[in-house]
Amino acid sequence: MALSSSKFSSFSGFSLSPVSGNGVQKPCFCDLRVGEKWGSRKFRVSATTAPLTGVIFEPFEEVKKDYLAVPSVPLVSLARQNFADECESVINEQINVEYNASYVYHSLFAYFDRDNVALKGFAKFFKESSEEHREHAEKLMKYQNTRGGRVVLHPIKDVPSEFEHVEKGDALYAMELALSLEKLTNEKLLNVHSVAERNNDLEMTHFIEGEYLAEQVEAIKKISEYVAQLRRVGKGHGVWHFDQRLLHGVHGA
């Protein structure tokens, strides 16, 4: 099929080969536009070899906006993507919560490790709790860096060093304090989760659910049982037996 070169409608997806005088077809890829004149040469229209399947993903085109968005300014994260400022801020707050909880537990460890208190099982339990919350803080710090946020450490509040209680005794009082602390930590974690949901950050919600919430519920259940048992034994000889169960890791204490 031969077409004159005066005026053409626009064609897409076709290769056009100019026909020489001897009828030999030469490769040529052109766009035909309305009103454009191409001289006296004739063109043959034929389908290209590439199938017209419809392009749904053009990586070099679609990456342009992300490539241009990659910061070149020093101290600006290259990894950050879809990470809201509110999410970054609440993670820093939770880091502070975990470090404060660790600090309280470390003070409890020091108290029960004294020579005139000498409840080694309680000291062991509270030291392990302190280390666990510190690990939680460090995990949050690592996550913050992974998402391209910036870790900002807030001040840690002073904590008491004496935990004797006239009515309850130090063991029960300390364990009730631990229970309140775990419940408060859980509330703070739920707030972190809600902030992630509000900002449609699915990765962050999965991180908090998988790494913290289930473990926190288990901790609350365990310490609740400890409080119930200590309320039964009172302040006397039963506290020593309970301490020994904590020290040797006996199931149920």
UniProtKB/Swiss-Prot annotation:
- Keywords carried by this UniProt record: Chloroplast, Iron, Iron storage, Metal-binding, Oxidoreductase, Plastid, Transit peptide
Q: Which CDD domains match?
A: Euk_Ferritin
Which reaction is the catalytic activity of this chain? 4 Fe(2+) + O2 + 4 H(+) = 4 Fe(3+) + 2 H2O
Q: Which residues bind Fe cation 1?
A: E98, H136
**GO-annotated biological processes:** intracellular iron ion homeostasis; iron ion transport
Into which EC class is this enzyme placed?
A: oxidoreductase
Gene Ontology cellular component annotations, sorted alphabetically: chloroplast
Q: Where is the Ferritin-like diiron domain?
A: 81-234
Q: Where in the sequence is the transit peptide found?
A: 1-47
Q: Which InterPro entries match?
A: Ferritin, Ferritin-like, Ferritin-like_diiron, Ferritin-like_SF, Ferritin_CS, Ferritin_DPS_dom
Q: Which GO terms describe its molecular function?
A: ferric iron binding; ferrous iron binding; ferroxidase activity
EC number in record: 1.16.3.1
Q: Where is it localised?
A: Plastid, Chloroplast; Plastid
Q: Which residues bind Fe cation 2?
A: E182, Q216
Q: Where is this region: Extension peptide (EP)?
A: 48-80
Respond yes or no to whether keyword Nucleus is given for this record: no
Q: Which residues form a coiled coil?
A: none
Q: Highest taxon of the source?
A: Eukaryota
- Subunit text: Oligomer of 24 subunits. There are two types of subunits: L (light) chain and H (heavy) chain. The major chain can be light or heavy, depending on the species and tissue type. The functional molecule forms a roughly spherical shell with a diameter of 12 nm and contains a central cavity into which the insoluble mineral iron core is deposited.
Q: Which family does this protein fall into?
A: Belongs to the ferritin family.
Function description: Stores iron in a soluble, non-toxic, readily available form. Important for iron homeostasis. Has ferroxidase activity. Iron is taken up in the ferrous form and deposited as ferric hydroxides after oxidation.
* Name this protein carries in UniProt: Ferritin-1, chloroplastic
Q: Which organism is it from?
A: Pisum sativum (Garden pea)
